[in-house]
Amino acid sequence: MQTIPDALFGIIGYPVSHSVSPAMQNAAFKHCKLNYLYLTIAAKPEDLQNVIASMRPLNIRGLNVTIPHKIEVIKYIDTLDPAAKKIGAVNTIVNENGQLKGYNTDFGGFVRLLEHNRIAPAKHRFALLGAGGSAHAISLAICTLGGHLTVLARQEEKAKDLAAKMCLRFKGKAQGLELNEANLEETLAESDIIVNCTPIGMGNLAGQSLIPPRLLRPDLTVIDAIYNPCKTRLLEDAEKKGAKIINGLEMLVWQGAMSFEIWTSQKAPFRVMMKEAEMALDENEK
């Protein structure tokens, strides 16, 4: 017989049905003998405020926040952790007796991904596609660790704004450009690591890529923050060109482990979470 959970958690986004976060977080709760339940919550942008407000009466203890809400959600929470305030995006919320506090674990998740793959940003030039919530955290990680960054986004103003925020802290280590083929060609010729922080390649956009295959080459490292599918069109094209490819699953699990620790004050069982995430992803792709 199922028992009523002692606390509810979840992930809010749109779309969100692809997420493996419920599988890995519920496995972590079970491993740590916590009677908690983690759910998916699909919320369109126009519903975001009401869903966040419902955390209080429904006593939802915590949420992860994913595309497209990581920046907009800041309007609807009470306080920000200093790191989230600096990044300007939130991917983790804690309900502390009715007070909603926002955190960002994407920064730490990306740093762990770089460390695991032995990438020292100070030695590299990065081309970052997108200027949304994940891009804010990842750009700060790159610049904090000494990397040179070019942000490319379809809305040039957003790319320039994000780059300007980085330049205020890191003295000219970032620039922002409109994402078009001419700027891509010029930027990629001068870069050795590409990071995709857009949703192009997942959900209804699966099978698409922002980068023409002719611009890819063997000496590149291509990182896609997307983890489902585990190999996007961008990663497939890069692999065919002989480039090193990295998907977003490891970053997802690291940031999820950090969220778990914020919510529970317990050490996250990283290996349990990674194994469960891999199994859930395999099941999703059948």
From Swiss-Prot:
Pathway connected to this protein: Metabolic intermediate biosynthesis; chorismate biosynthesis; chorismate from D-erythrose 4-phosphate and phosphoenolpyruvate: step 4/7
Catalytic center residues: 70 (proton acceptor)
Highest taxon in the source lineage: Bacteria
Gene Ontology BP term (one): aromatic amino acid family biosynthetic process
Enzyme Commission no: 1.1.1.25
Residues binding shikimate, per UniProt: 19-21, 66, 91, 106, 227
A Gene Ontology molecular function term of the record: NADP binding
Keyword tags: Amino-acid biosynthesis, Aromatic amino acid biosynthesis, NADP, Oxidoreductase
Annotated Pfam families: SDH_C, Shikimate_dh_N
Binding, NADP(+): 130-134, 225, 248
Family matches, as InterPro entries: Aminoacid_DH-like_N_sf, NAD(P)-bd_dom_sf, SDH_C, Shikimate_DH, Shikimate_DH-bd_N, Shikimate_DH_fam
Subunit structure, as described in the record: Homodimer.
Main function: Involved in the biosynthesis of the chorismate, which leads to the biosynthesis of aromatic amino acids. Catalyzes the reversible NADPH linked reduction of 3-dehydroshikimate (DHSA) to yield shikimate (SA).
Protein name per the record: Shikimate dehydrogenase (NADP(+))
Organism whose genome encodes this protein: Dehalococcoides mccartyi (strain CBDB1)
